[in-house]
Design a protein with these regions (language model features):
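Formylglycine-dependent sulfatase
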Residues: 15-471, 477-514
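Bacterial N-terminal signal peptides
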Residues: 1-8
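Membrane-interface motif at the C-terminal end of an N-terminal transmembrane signal
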Residues: 8-14
Length: 514
């Protein structure tokens, strides 16, 4: 691991904006472990889906020991925009970004002077670390020192691996980073980044003939692979590195709080579970991969317990978007398991299955055990919540779409909604807005996947308003989004569309002077 001090100028300025103490009145400040799954659906976790065919005992234990949110949402229906929004508290459509990076990916979507979640926490005295998939963009240089702009495999072959990455996570608020540029087993560059370097560069083309072949091994592209990079062991390597950080930190700085962002590969296709998990469930390689994810969560919790810090660590577990199309279609057909259940839609779709995600919080003596919340929340809310938790003051040009949900964690929100409105976006930059039970989609169709043909055609629903320019659903009476009320409720359509336009133009949805 590499320890680097960055942004000295901006830290000195922002330090003046930070309150002393912490708003929650908690001393000492808690550690924070944030675990982000990849493409894990609402129905993939057994505490959310009684009919799940895959056991997830460690996630179920998290729910029993903490709070389970039933109306939590990723800000986007695909990876990169969600990750950007999580670490900045800002919707990615505000920087006109919608899709995902691949290969070396970049440049970084987060501006050099933009306040991030880890930077904010570091300014409050936290040691900050990230392990796993970054996927928010990096800048690699060629042998002439020029920024590489060519995509995919062609760009990977141009990288001068003796040069540092100029906008790595350690330049955006993390003290330490070990992980990958994009999807670890998908995207052209199969190598680990340590700090701002790739210590073991890729030396040869990936030999795909040696990888598992099955219905869930799709989405693995030909790329350059490093000698130490085993595609079936990536998540176990990430687990090892996160454990090492936790053990080292508690040994060397027992009184200093930590923020660890553990960003998994699982369960993004291809489903390449580590060998010890092959066949552990009766639901094929993808089910085994889900079980491996659950195992990793359990191992991280065991590490906290072994180190004696579990009771003063806020643990948050969630997913970056809904489940992938192929995994849902195949798992339904092969094993009767539905990762999107009970919602309509999958990853990329504006319907609930594309962005309603599992969200679990554990914090002994603060978050009530075996509790649940139906508050509508977004992953963008993490930044404002951590600001409230640690006493940081958010400037008005930061975390523009982040709401403080700490009162919900602490059981002090009452029945009042934290959010009046919640925004969503898809990989086509289609937008939607939610207010209470009402959800307005400012577009036709899913906003992402095509249901006219292909593997999703069998799951297309009849369109009762085919000429409508948008969609309106009442999730209280129609949680499956089966009946478009666009023509039946014209005033509600007008109201929500106007509010959506207003929030887009305003540049923020969160209140000022939080």
């Amino acid at each position: 691991m590499v320890l680097v001090l960055v942004f000295q100028g901006s830290i000195s300025v922002r330090a003046q904006e930070v309150k002393l103490g912490n708003v929650a009145g908690l001393a000492p400040l808690p550690n924070i472990l944030f675990i982000l799954a990849d493409d894990l659906g609402y129905g993939d976790v057994s505490c959310y889906n009684r009919d799940s065919k895959v056991p997830t005992p460690n996630l179920d234990r998290l729910a029993l020991e903490g709070m389970r949110f039933t109306d939590a949402h990723s800000p986007s229906t695909v990876c990169t925009p969600t990750r950007y929004s999580l670490l900045t508290g800002q919707m990615a459509f505000r920087i006109n970004y919608r899709n995902v990076f691949s290969g070396i990916g970049g440049p970084c979507l987060i501006k050099n002077n933009q306040l991030t979640l880890p930077q904010m926490l570091r300014e409050r005295g936290y040691s900050t670390a990230m392990t796993g998939k970054w996927h928010i963009g990096l800048s690699f240089l060629d042998q002439g020192g020029k920024l590489i702009t060519k995509p995919d495999l062609e760009g990977v072959k141009l990288v001068d691996y003796s040069r540092a990455i100029s906008d790595a996570p350690i330049h955006r608020g993390f003290d330490r980073f070990f992980g990958t540029a994009c999807c670890p087993t998908t995207d052209f560059l199969y190598a680990f980044i340590d700090g701002d370097r790739i210590p073991v560069p890729p030396t040869k083309l990936l030999d795909k003939t040696k990888l598992p072949k099955h219905a869930y091994s799709v989405d693995n592209r030909l790329g350059m692979v490093a000698p130490d990079f085993n595609l079936e062991e990536v998540d176990m390597v990430f687990l090892k590195k996160s454990r090492e950080f936790l053990e080292s930190h508690v040994l060397r700085s027992p009184k200093k709080p930590f923020f660890l962002f553990h960003s998994m590969q699982a369960i993004h296709l291809p489903s390449f579970p580590a060998p010890q998990f092959n066949g552990i469930t009766k639901t094929g390689p993808h089910g085994d991969f889900i079980h491996q994810l659950d195992h990793i969560v359990g191992e991280l919790m065991k590490t906290l317990e072994k180190l004696g810090v579990a009771d003063n660590t806020l643990v948050v577990f969630t997913s970056d978007n809904g489940p992938e199309t192929t995994s849902v279609v195949r798992m339904r057909a092969d094993y009767g398991h539905d990762g999107a259940k009970p919602w309509r839609g999958v990853k990329r779709d504006q319907w609930e299955g594309g962005h309603r995600v599992p969200f679990l919080v554990r914090w002994p003596n603060n978050v009530a055990p075996n509790s649940s919340s139906s508050q509508t929340i977004s992953l963008t809310d993490i930044m404002a919540t951590c600001a409230a938790l640690t006493g940081a003051t958010l400037p008005n040009n930061a975390a523009e779409d982040s709401f403080n949900i700490l009162p919900v964690f602490l059981g002090k929100a009452g029945g009042k909604p934290i959010r009046d409105f919640t925004l969503h976006q898809t990989n086509s930059l289609a937008l939607s807005i939610r207010q209470g039970p009402w959800k307005y989609l400012d577009h036709r169709g899913s906003g992402g996947n095509r249901y006219e043909k292909g593997e999703l055609a069998a799951f297309a629903l009849p369109d009762n308003a085919p000429t409508a320019l948008g969609q309106l659903y009442n999730l209280e009476t129609d949680p499956g989004e089966t009946k478009n009320l666009y023509f039946e409720q014209p005033l509600k359509v007008k109201e929500l569309k106007a509010k959506l336009d207003e929030l887009v133009k305003a540049g923020r949805s969160a209140p000022v002077m939080r």
